Regions:
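C-terminal interaction-tip segments
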Residues: 1-33, 37, 43, 95-114
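Hydrophobic beta-strand core residues of beta-sandwich domains
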Residues: 26-28, 69-70, 85
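Short loop/turn positions at the edges of beta-strands in beta-sheet-rich folds
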Residues: 42-46, 85-87
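Short, surface-exposed beta-strand/strand-loop-strand elements in extracellular ectodomains
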Residues: 45-66
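Short proline/glycine- and polar residue-rich coil/turn motifs
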Residues: 67-75
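Exposed aromatic-hydrophobic patches
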Residues: 74-82
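Noncatalytic modules at the cell exterior or secretory-pathway interfaces
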Residues: 83-97
Length: 114
């Protein structure tokens, strides 16, 4: 059973180009979380490449390369991945240009089977 529903986001002015930024990190006191909707919007005129990764420390657990050259002018990419996250896992995002908004809908506090 889920305890908390979250919407995590990073606005265009809140990230650095070609730098991994943490969109969401699972609290160590929770038993897990799940990403069930992810959206990226490109509001500028330039095309941009999007990357997403799930990491725990230095270990890459899951990697997603978004559509190559996501077009500008408000084009969005929506994706559902059903990724189960454990304590200390981080959902990180990276964009090759400015003007991108990242959003994720996350259920945290999942009761995972022992």
């Amino acid at each position: 059973m889920a305890e908390v529903f979250n919407r995590a986001y990073i606005e265009p002015e809140d990230y650095q180009i070609n730098t991994w930024m943490t969109l969401y990190k699972v609290n160590t006191q929770l038993t897990g979380a799940m990403v069930f909707d992810f959206s990226v919007s490109n509001m500028k005129d330039n095309n941009v490449t999007i990357e997403i990764q799930l990491v725990n420390g230095e270990n890459i657990l899951h990697y997603i390369l978004g559509p190559t050259e996501l077009q500008g002018q408000g084009i969005a990419w929506d994706s559902s991945h059903k990724i189960v996250m454990m304590p200390n896992d981080e959902l990180q995002v990276k964009a090759s240009a400015e003007g991108v908004s990242f959003y994720a809908s996350i259920v945290s506090g999942l009761k995972l089977p022992a």
